[in-house]
């Protein structure tokens, strides 16, 4: 279930309010390809033998939302590593925006019952679904101003789970890493959907070659650390971290629905013929 599946605005408002009622849209409007301030991530695993049917329905849903100019956007990704699954990357500037989108979507489904039926058909082909809300932490991100998601073809998402009360240790480790960092990544704090504290590190990639480049960049960044920083980071990893899992996802524009401004960043890729 993506945001398209949220048809109960009261429940949605409760979820967002419980997540973090203090996040609101402020400041100048960012560029269309900038990492969003708020993420709704939905991970789906399909029933055996139903992946192709779900994919067909997702492509058709994307086309219908384009046709009706529904102002709700998402990027659909498929797992390259880890278990087979889909991941929906729904951007927003605030939790309030997600709240409004949920109410808007309920109205769209009411006016277009064929879309609601199509969504139901998708959900009938799912074995499981998990929804996560996360908010960008600018002070932990680095190089985020260089990120342009319109050019991305893959996303590497690292999930970092911490022991309770060790958020400051994670922040310290990220701050120490920033000293010699050359890569670009956006860091998000999970506020609903996973055990807390959990952070997400999102890194856009333009090709699979960037995966190899990223490994080399990470190696150089680690070599560039001062000895004291390296030892402190290792200590934090041992004492504060519960788990780290990194996976690669491929973007599928034919199953995505992005804004015209976003698509203009690379129309040959995002606008399907």
Segments (PLM) and residue ranges:
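Short S/T/G/P-rich N-terminal loop/turn motif that feeds into the first structured element of a domain
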Residues: 22-273
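Bacterial N-terminal signal peptides
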Residues: 8-19
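Residue-level detector of intrinsically disordered, flexible termini
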Residues: 4, 18, 22-24
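N-terminal secretory signal peptides that target proteins for export/translocation
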Residues: 1-8
């Amino acid at each position: 279930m993506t945001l398209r599946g949220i048809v109960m605005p009261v429940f949605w408002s409760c979820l967002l309010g419980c997540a973090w009622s203090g996040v609101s849209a402020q400041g100048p409007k960012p560029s269309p390809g900038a990492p969003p301030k708020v993420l709704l991530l939905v991970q789906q695993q399909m029933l055996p033998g139903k992946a192709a049917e779900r994919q067909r329905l997702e492509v058709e849903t994307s086309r219908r939302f384009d046709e009706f100019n529904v102002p709700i956007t998402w990027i659909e990704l498929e797992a390259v590593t880890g278990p087979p699954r889909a991941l929906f990357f729904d951007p927003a500037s605030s939790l309030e925006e997600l709240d409004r989108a949920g109410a808007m979507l309920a109205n769209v489904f009411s006016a277009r019952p064929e879309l609601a039926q199509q969504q139901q058909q998708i959900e009938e082909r799912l074995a499981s679904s998990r929804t996560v809300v996360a908010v960008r932490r600018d002070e932990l991100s680095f190089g985020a101003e260089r990120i342009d998601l319109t050019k991305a073809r893959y996303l590497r998402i690292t999930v970092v789970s911490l022991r309770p009360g060790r958020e400051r240790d994670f922040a310290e480790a990220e701050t120490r890493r920033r000293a010699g960092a050359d890569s670009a990544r956006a860091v998000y704090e999970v506020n609903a959907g996973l055990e807390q504290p959990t952070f997400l590190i999102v890194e856009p990639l333009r090709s699979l070659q960037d995966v190899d480049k990223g490994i080399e960049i990470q190696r150089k960044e680690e070599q560039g650390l001062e000895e004291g920083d390296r030892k402190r980071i290792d200590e934090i990893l041992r004492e504060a971290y519960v788990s780290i899992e990194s996976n690669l996802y491929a973007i599928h524009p034919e199953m995505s629905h992005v804004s015209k401004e976003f698509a203009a960043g690379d129309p040959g890729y995002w606008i399907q013929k």
